[in-house]
C-alpha cells in the first residue's frame, strides 16, 4: 500500500513539471526530439521568434487591427517555465473581418523577438483565438522607464497565493492602438511550436519601472530566462 502511494505521488509530481525547458538536454535545441508532438520545433518552416529586419507597417488598410478591449477579470496560473494570465472576457481584436478573442498573456525574459539584432529586457505576448481556432498574437516589447499603473494589478496577483484570486485589467491602457507594427506568419514560441500564428510585433516598446520589471522576472519567471532563440525566417514569403 505504501509503495502504491509513493508511486502515485511521484506520478502526480511528474505531471506538474513540463518535459521541456530552456536549458541543457531539454532546452530549445532539443525540443523537436523530445516528443513526436514537438516535431515542428525542429522541422517547422515558419517558426517563431525571429530577428526582424523588414520595415514596420501602419495600422490600417490591408493590415488594420481593430481593438475591442475593456476592463476584464484575469487570473494567474504559475507554470514551471512561465506565468500565465488568463482572461474571463469576450474582448477581441478584428483582423480582415475575423474576430480573434482574447485568451491569455505570457512574459518572456529577455525578449524573444529581436529588431535588427536588438533585444529588450522583457516581452509580453497577448494571445487571441478565432472561433475556427486560428491564433493571433500581439508581441509588445518592454523597456525600463516610468511606472505603468496597469501592470501593478498583475504584479499584485503574482504576490497573491490565494486560489482563485483575480484582478481587473484594461488592455486598452497598455496596447498602443496607433503604433506601427511588424507582421509575419509564425508559430507558438514554446512546444509543440504549432504554426499558423499571425504575429503583430509592436514597434514601440512600452515602459515599466525597473522595480516592476524585476518583480515580473523574479516572481513570475522565478528569476530565470525563458526566451527561445530566434529562428530562421523565410522573407521571400513577404
Regions found by a protein language model. Give the residues of each.
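Positively charged n-region of N-terminal signal peptides that target proteins for export
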Residues: 1-4, 117
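Alpha-carbonic anhydrase
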Residues: 16-238
Amino acid at each position: 500500500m505504501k509503495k502504491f502511494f509513493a508511486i502515485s505521488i511521484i506520478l502526480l509530481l511528474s505531471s506538474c513539471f513540463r518535459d521541456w525547458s530552456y536549458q541543457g538536454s531539454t532546452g530549445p535545441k532539443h525540443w523537436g526530439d523530445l516528443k513526436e508532438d514537438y516535431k515542428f520545433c525542429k522541422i517547422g518552416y515558419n517558426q517563431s521568434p525571429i530577428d526582424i529586419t523588414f520595415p514596420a507597417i501602419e495600422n490600417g488598410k490591408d493590415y488594420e487591427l481593430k481593438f475591442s478591449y475593456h476592463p476584464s477579470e484575469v487570473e494567474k496560473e504559475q507554470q514551471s517555465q512561465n506565468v500565465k494570465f488568463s482572461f474571463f472576457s469576450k474582448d477581441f481584436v478584428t483582423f480582415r473581418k475575423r474576430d480573434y478573442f482574447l485568451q491569455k498573456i505570457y512574459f518572456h525574459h529577455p525578449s524573444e523577438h529581436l529588431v535588427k539584432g536588438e533585444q529588450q529586457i522583457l516581452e509580453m505576448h497577448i494571445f487571441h483565438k478565432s472561433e475556427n481556432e486560428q491564433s493571433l498574437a500581439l508581441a509588445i516589447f518592454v523597456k525600463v522607464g516610468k511606472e505603468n499603473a496597469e501592470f501593478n494589478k498583475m504584479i499584485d496577483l503574482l504576490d497573491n497565493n490565494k486560489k482563485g484570486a483575480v484582478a481587473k485589467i484594461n488592455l486598452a491602457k497598455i496596447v498602443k492602438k496607433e503604433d506601427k507594427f511588424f507582421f509575419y506568419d509564425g508559430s507558438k514560441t514554446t512546444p509543440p511550436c504549432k504554426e499558423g500564428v499571425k504575429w503583430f510585433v509592436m514597434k514601440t516598446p512600452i515602459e515599466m519601472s525597473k522595480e516592476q520589471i524585476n518583480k515580473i522576472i523574479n516572481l513570475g519567471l522565478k528569476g530565470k530566462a525563458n526566451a527561445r532563440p530566434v529562428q530562421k525566417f523565410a522573407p521571400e514569403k513577404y
